């Protein structure tokens, strides 16, 4: 009779410790480091280890925010987004939510905050624009919203690589090329008179090589501020997040950035990544990097590697050396280090993005604009749905609702109006 693989018997002590850990999972330590080399002065960062509290006055509900803004055609949009985006996010989240509810509405609130920030900045009538990569860390849950090409990656404690942001460069995203051309704009390289096409793919009018950003009011309305949002949950082994501008990613692959910084504390790691990026060809662009380590509580900071490289060194970042029997047993029968995907949506349809999670939010804020949060009288708002009569399950509310100006913004984002310069 053929023998099957025997099931692994896990000691009772290990099982009991797992049960206790799952019931009382401690908050991680969040450590961050930043490095930047400036050429144009258009990169800005936001580093807030304690950005706010889900429950006012309760420090145990604090969350962290780390963001990178890579401006272009001036620094105005990047500075404005840095100053206003977090406040717009907090206004879009109802009060009185449990932690699970807060995390559930966070992706929708991020979309609203990005769109409001863009709408308000364009009212200033300045033509600069900016990428945004905005990271919210609540205990072991990481939520990333991004427009542009300031990429964000995660390396888990076992060395697995996860992409937490999208790349909205036309050269890298055929779906965005199709979306923009369907809206009536053209995508192509710079065409020199009498010569070949040169450079990256760009959107015309405007010549921007990104399909999503905040600002950029001088280009067609097909360049939108609706972010890609991804939410994941780390295991209690932790992980390392790297956020960097294209000054880094134009010269380093994700693996190269991880390799040159692995095993070092976050501040040293960020410096090593920036130096590695500018070493081959010198400083050609603003080059900025943020490194965030999410560590099991009370774990020692990593030491620089000597001869050892690779995943073993990275794993040492998250574990102290132990000699007691219980630790040896825990390591021998350790559960797999997994990163759980909770949410992932990069749709450009603002109505779809705002409707996600609305049933929960409508319990708290049924009559406010889903973008700017202005209070609406009953029957005053405009439903995001193209045909509200098809949505009887919303029991007459037919929400979410928008004010008149935000509804015009939605129509522009969804290509229901021609580009400004057409």
Curated annotation (Swiss-Prot):
GO MF annotation terms: metal ion binding; protein serine/threonine phosphatase activity
Annotated positions binding Mn(2+) 1: 70-71
Disulfide cysteine pairs (residue numbers): none
Catalytic reaction equation(s): O-phospho-L-seryl-[protein] + H2O = L-seryl-[protein] + phosphate; O-phospho-L-threonyl-[protein] + H2O = L-threonyl-[protein] + phosphate
Positions of the PPM-type phosphatase domain: 45-294
Record's keyword annotation contains Magnesium: yes
Cofactor(s) demanded: Mg(2+); Mn(2+)
PROSITE patterns for this protein: PPM_2
Documented EC number(s): 3.1.3.16
Residues engaged in binding Mn(2+) 2: 70, 246, 285
Biological process annotations from GO: regulation of intracellular signal transduction
Alphabetized UniProt keyword annotations: Hydrolase, Magnesium, Manganese, Metal-binding, Protein phosphatase
InterPro entries noted in UniProt: PP2C, PPM-type-like_dom_sf, PPM-type_phosphatase-like_dom
Listed Pfam families: PP2C
PANTHER family, A to Z: PROTEIN PHOSPHATASE
Family assignment from sequence similarity: Belongs to the PP2C family.
Name of the protein this chain belongs to: Probable protein phosphatase 2C 69
